[in-house]
């Protein structure tokens, strides 16, 4: 994945943090070894932290040798403004979106993702910029906010997706019902990570962090 990325991580003290971490690193690869790409040499246990990607494709030239200063210069919204709420489980025919939990796209999510894109890629001040507004619409249509659960090259059938959803819910992640009568759980706020995602997956570690 070219460049660096901005991720939103659940607060480390939140109950969902260890649940999602265990699902991603052990439970799902064990139950769905083919779909999780566990045989892929690029992947090892605990291969990525639970996160919602805010933006990718960020040039290292932007933050230079002081990534923390750059990250702190961005006027991030408060924790109360950012509410991550899970919807259902989906899959796309893309390695990094092989299986993921969709996140409800509300104004708070638009604001933080748009800000990340504006400052990290588009050279704009905030999500109101023309290029960022265009990107937000494209992002919404293509895949939107989500938390990846499995990377891999193997297509996942609808029946297997239902099995994944069952495992995820049994682990303690509440998903929204399709009719919209029940809202999924999630977290408020979190920690923004700046991660050089042009490295191997095993080396995806933050070089700067910012608590909302």
UniProtKB/Swiss-Prot annotation:
It comes from the Eukaryota. GO terms for molecular function: 2',3'-cyclic-nucleotide 3'-phosphodiesterase activity. Keywords: Golgi apparatus, Hydrolase. InterPro entries: Cyclic-nucl_3Pdiesterase, Cyclic_Pdiesterase. It is an enzyme of class 3 (hydrolase). Substrate binds at residues 53, 148, 151. Its EC number is 3.1.4.37. GO terms for cellular component: Golgi apparatus. The keyword S-adenosyl-L-methionine does not apply. Involved in the metabolism of ADP-ribose 1',2'-cyclic phosphate which is produced as a consequence of tRNA splicing. This is 2',3'-cyclic-nucleotide 3'-phosphodiesterase. The gene is cpd-7.
């Amino acid at each position: 994945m070219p460049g660096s990325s901005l991720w939103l991580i659940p607060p480390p003290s939140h109950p969902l943090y260890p649940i999602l971490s265990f699902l991603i690193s052990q439970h799902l690869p064990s139950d769905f070894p083919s779909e999780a790409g566990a045989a892929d040499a690029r992947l090892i246990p605990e291969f990525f932290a639970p996160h919602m990607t805010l933006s990718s494709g960020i040039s290292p030239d932007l933050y230079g040798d002081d990534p923390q200063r750059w990250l702190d210069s961005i006027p991030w919204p408060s924790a109360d403004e950012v509410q991550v709420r899970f919807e259902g489980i989906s899959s796309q025919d893309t390695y990094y979106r092989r299986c993921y939990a969709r996140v409800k796209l509300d104004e708070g999510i638009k604001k933080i993702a748009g800000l990340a894109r504006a400052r990290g890629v588009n050279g704009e001040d905030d999500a109101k910029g023309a290029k960022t507004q265009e990107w937000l619409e494209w992002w919404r249509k293509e895949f939107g906010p989500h938390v990846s659960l499995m990377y891999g090259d193997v297509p996942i059938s609808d029946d297997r997706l239902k099995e994944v959803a069952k495992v995820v819910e049994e682990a303690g992640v509440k998903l929204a019902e399709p009719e919209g009568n029940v809202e999924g759980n999630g977290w408020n706020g979190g920690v923004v990570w700046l991660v050089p995602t042009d490295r191997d997956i095993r080396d995806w570690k933050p070089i700067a962090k910012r608590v909302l």
